[in-house]
A protein has these predicted regions:
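Functional-site microenvironments in short loops/helix caps that host divalent-cation chemistry
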Residues: 1-15, 52-186
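Residues that act as N-cap/strand-start positions at coil-to-secondary-structure junctions
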Residues: 17-19
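Proline-centered helix-kink/hinge sites
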Residues: 21-22, 36, 68, 89
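Well-ordered beta-strand positions in beta-sheet-rich domains
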Residues: 22-24, 29
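Short capping motifs at secondary-structure boundaries
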Residues: 30, 37, 43-54, 84-85
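Generic detection of long, well-ordered alpha-helical segments
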Residues: 35-36, 145
Length: 186
């Protein structure tokens, strides 16, 4: 069924200039994986397709099977999704999955709580993909804030969301973007 809500941040001191103004977005129904892509799953793809391993693949802080893959670029993420018969979600789908029907600021609500996600620029390592069950989004998706960034299908344009019209299944502009991570690992 179609989904409508105000997408992106309202203009405020906290919002970045390219995150507004808020606007209405309609999305068709879609499915999203519950967890970030694990090193185990990504390793199967690397082996089966002969795909190059991503950055950090040999880093012992980041390469346990249950940890999310780190260092994959946009093309790697897209190729992995296609291998699994899936696709990268557009930013609007990822944002809906993270914020829920009330458009929360964080997957768990509107108050920042660093104990509910793997945050910080001095992280020693990523956490397993099923970490922080108390911060699972309304739609049941883990780690939509913190841990590693997630690539989306859209590309970046600082003026893209400056339009005020309603959007239906937006696909975004022309430079790749990621969402949700720690600021440390992609």
């Amino acid at each position: 069924t179609p989904y409508d809500r105000r997408m992106k941040a309202p203009w405020s001191a906290e919002a970045l200039r390219d995150e507004g103004p808020a606007h209405m977005v309609f999305l068709d129904s879609y499915l999203m994986d519950t967890y970030e892509v694990s090193n185990k799953d990504y390793g199967e793809f690397v082996t089966a397709k002969g795909h190059p391993a991503p950055a950090y693949w040999d880093d012992p802080r980041l390469n346990k099977p249950e940890q999310p893959v780190a260092g994959a670029n946009w093309e790697d993420a897209k190729a992995f999704c296609e291998y699994r018969g899936k696709r990268l979600p557009p930013e609007a789908e990822s944002e809906k999955a993270a914020r829920g029907p009330k458009a929360n600021l964080y997957p768990w609500g509107n108050e920042f709580d660093p104990a509910k996600a793997n945050y910080g620029r001095n992280l020693e390592a990523t956490m397993p993909v099923d970490s922080y069950p108390e911060s699972v989004s309304f739609y049941g998706v883990y780690n939509m804030a913190g841990n590693v960034f997630e690539w989306v299908a859209d590309w970046y344009d600082p003026r893209y969301y400056g339009r005020l019209e309603t959007m239906v299944n937006p696909t975004g502009p022309a430079k790749p973007i990621w969402m949700g991570g720690t600021g440390t690992y992609v």
